[in-house]
Amino acid sequence: MVNFYDVTLRDGNHAARHTLSAKFVADYCDIADKSGLWGVEVGHGNGIGASSFLVGKASTSDQVLLETARAHLGRAKLSVHLIPGFATIKKDIIPAIDIGVDVFRVGTHVTEVDTARKHIEFISEHNKICHGVMMMSHTVDARSQAAQAIELERFGASAVIVMDSAGHFVPSDVRERIRSIKDSVDVAVGFHAHNNLEMGVANALMALEEGAQIIDGSSMGLGAGSGNASLEAIIVNYRRSFADDQELTPYLEMSQLVELECQDFLPRTTSSSIQSGNAGVFSGFAPQVRQISNEFGISQEELWQELGKRRLVAGQESMIREIAQDLMNL
């Protein structure tokens, strides 16, 4: 059985510059709860606890968004993303448990899953579903990623998620990752696509073909940079490719709501998203790259490539200016 997981109200908050309102969350969850979705992820784009001047202040608090979603979800599981360092057990995880969050996804750089251990163990001890998310998956080979997945399983994660944060993968990459990890762990394996190189839906379908049990998507692809894999496109192609009778209408209704309410934030492929995907860099850096490259008089492509060489990850926005200065001094 495949569990479809909706990140519109979390990853989509990146695109909306962390301004998604409680009313929008309520309206969206009302439809999502009838769709057959397994989980609906809600919160700041960088996860609960991340609202800050560094990565963006949210216009509505995590608490309000989660309480709103909780009141409008009965069938689908209320889920959150969190990154150790932004989120702490006392400040963020315990309040989320008290609100009634069902699923916690703990995200780390693919080479640093050990930083998730304390959070995963705490969440698991409180009988909540916990997934380990390996961000920036393209920065290691398949065998190394499988080794990290084994560690997440050992910590207590009930699923491990391959996150293509930079939208760098093509389907053959996804095939290799999913196969390697499924051969290495006994827990469920999931995949989270980004669409920098217009491969999001194709990559999600490849993950399905290789037996991934959890597939992420967002309505209209609403997400950081050039967005995520379009949830409605995944569903319609899944129906066609796997002869499944998944109901399509609610997904189209969610898509229409996003199209109506988030017109100014809908993702599109730009030269910047292509450059970030090619360089293997988190596309949420696009506003800073654009501003700083103009300020320093250097090309965006040159700056993207240097960020890729230095393997910057989300949360390291403050380093972009330093790197631009280094390029000026070459």
Identify the residue ranges that each predicted region occupies.
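Catalytic cores and adjacent flexible loops of soluble metabolic enzymes
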Residues: M1-L330
